[in-house]
Each structure stands twice: as structure tokens, then as C-alpha cells.
Amino acid sequence: MFINYAHRGASEYAPENTMSAFNMALQLGANGIELDLQRTRDGKIVIFHDNKIDNKSNKKGKISDYTYQELLDFDFGSWFSLKYKGEKIVLFEDFAKKFLSKSLTFAIELKDEGIEKETFDVIKKCNA
């Protein structure tokens, strides 16, 4: 079987690793999604690729510098296009609830050490 991976979602058409990019990937016919996971300061697992948020949001620093609640106040879409102003960072559990039940293949890169068990627990919980 051929897998058409949407790298960080449909990142050519919407801000990478956002719900807009993941939804667009499905609309364009992707049957696989690649995404990256990191841990916030308060231990939440979010989807984000870069080491720093500087180029993909309206703030500066690392994901681990902020709580998930703080990150929700940031704009992760305007860097790509004003059409996506206000785009939010994605909690992995929210992604999993929406997409794991679909007939897709996933490539998940863990950017932080020690998040393997939590990631697997979310997958088990949302894929039951």
C-alpha cells in the first residue's frame, strides 16, 4: 500500500502542525499524517516541530518555557497567512480524539525524551 503522508499536516496550504493543516490534509486525500510532539512546562503533550516558537507564533521561547494554557493565548497562524490568524497550538489528545479513529497511518516524532509512555497512553485511550 502506498502512503501519502501529509508532513506536519498539509503544511504547504496551512500552518504546519495545526488543526487547519491536519483537516486540509484529509481534504486533499492524504492517508497518513506526520507530526511532532513536545511537552509543555506543565507536562501537557502538544504538537509542534521547532525547538523554539519564535518563527511560528507571535511569541518567543521554547514550548517547555510555557504552560499549555499560556500557549493557547499565542497566535500560531499569522506567520503563515492572516487567513489563519488566531490558530491555536494543538494538544495531542485533542488530535488523537479526532484523527485516530480514521483510516490513517501516523508517523509521530517525539521531540522530548520521556514522553513515550504518555504518548502511548493517549493513543490507547483515544483508539479504544
Q: Which residues fall in each region the model found?
A:
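Phosphate-group recognition and catalysis centered on beta-loop-alpha active-site segments
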Residues: 1-128
